[in-house]
């Protein structure tokens, strides 16, 4: 069993839910811009709430757009998760968009992350905090699986398997107990461990008994479920009485 970091996933633009999750003790919370209606204004409010409640606000991007990366980082996100990464070039572009010149291509602005321009906060962020931004990629396809070793050789913090998209790419959508899926997991885990990066898994269904099982496989970052599934499962409890 490896040391485990547990976070969760937020897809509803509701600050109270974000605060409840942070107060519950999740180490990090991923604000999902890919499969939700959350916009940049709402994302900034969620980032603020999560941050002030003592959890790390991460953002899953809707794609690979450098301008979106710039905006969520300026809003104060502590890390980003890039979906459907399949090539080294995509990874390098994501990393570059997170860093200021000369290390990258990110434009410099004065927003929440930079203390709204106050000199000491701005300088601290530019000189120190920007280097603490965590960068994660999602491996969700056969092409990403094929190139994962090269992808992981870049300067990233870790990866997350996108179980639904990966299983669909393996021609078994939503099935995570096939030989093909298990073999894909092994290949990705092995490549990540070689590079010394974190191994993440999004456990979509809120089944706490699966956490230790995933940890035993080698995953050390687990996103436990998502707000809509937690709400749906809990809402149905009175009607599932035996």
Residue ranges and their predicted role:
Residues 9-10, 29-38, 57-63, 79-87, ...:
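Catalytic beta/alpha-barrel core
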Residues 24-28, 74-79, 99-100, 153-158, ...:
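Glycine-enriched alpha-helix->loop->beta-strand junction motifs that scaffold or abut catalytic
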Residues 8, 21, 32, 72, ...:
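Conserved, mostly hydrophobic/aromatic
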Residues 46, 50, 88-104, 173, ...:
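C-terminal helical cap(s) of enzyme catalytic domains, especially alpha/beta-barrels
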Residues 40-74, 96-103, 126-131, 177-200:
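Alpha-helix-loop-beta-strand connector modules within alpha/beta enzyme cores
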Residues 67, 82-155:
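Conserved anion-binding
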Residues 1-65, 96, 135, 152-157, ...:
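Conserved N-terminal beta1-alpha1 strand-loop-helix module at the mouth
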Residues 79-93, 106, 159-170, 219-236:
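Glycine-rich phosphate-binding active-site loops on the catalytic face of alpha/beta enzymes
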């Amino acid at each position: 069993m490896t040391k485990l970091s547990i976070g969760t996933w937020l897809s509803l633009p509701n600050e109270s839910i974000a605060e409840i999750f942070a107060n519950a003790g999740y180490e990090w919370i991923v604000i999902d811009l890919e499969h939700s209606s959350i916009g940049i204004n709402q994302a900034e409010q969620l980032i603020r709430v999560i941050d002030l409640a003592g959890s790390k606000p991460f953002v899953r991007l809707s794609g690979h757009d450098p301008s979106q990366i710039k905006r969520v980082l300026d809003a104060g996100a502590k890390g980003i998760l890039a979906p459907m990464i399949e090539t080294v070039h995509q990874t390098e572009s994501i990393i570059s968009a997170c860093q200021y010149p000369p290390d990258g291509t990110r434009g410099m602005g004065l927003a929440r992350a930079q203390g709204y321009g106050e000199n000491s906060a701005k300088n601290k962020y530019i000189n120190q905090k920007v280097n603490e931004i965590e960068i994660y990629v999602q491996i969700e396809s056969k092409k990403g699986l094929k190139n994962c070793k090269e992808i992981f050789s870049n300067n990233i913090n870790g990866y997350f398997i996108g179980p639904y998209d990966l299983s669909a790419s393996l021609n078994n959508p939503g099935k995570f107990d096939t030989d093909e899926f298990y073999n894909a997991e092994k290949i990705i885990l092995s490549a990540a461990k070689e590079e010394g990066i974190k191994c993440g898994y999004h456990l979509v269904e809120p089944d706490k008994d699966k956490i230790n099982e995933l940890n035993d496989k080698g995953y050390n970052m687990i996103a436990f479920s998502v707000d809509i599934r937690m709400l749906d499962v809990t809402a149905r409890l009175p009607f599932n009485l035996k």
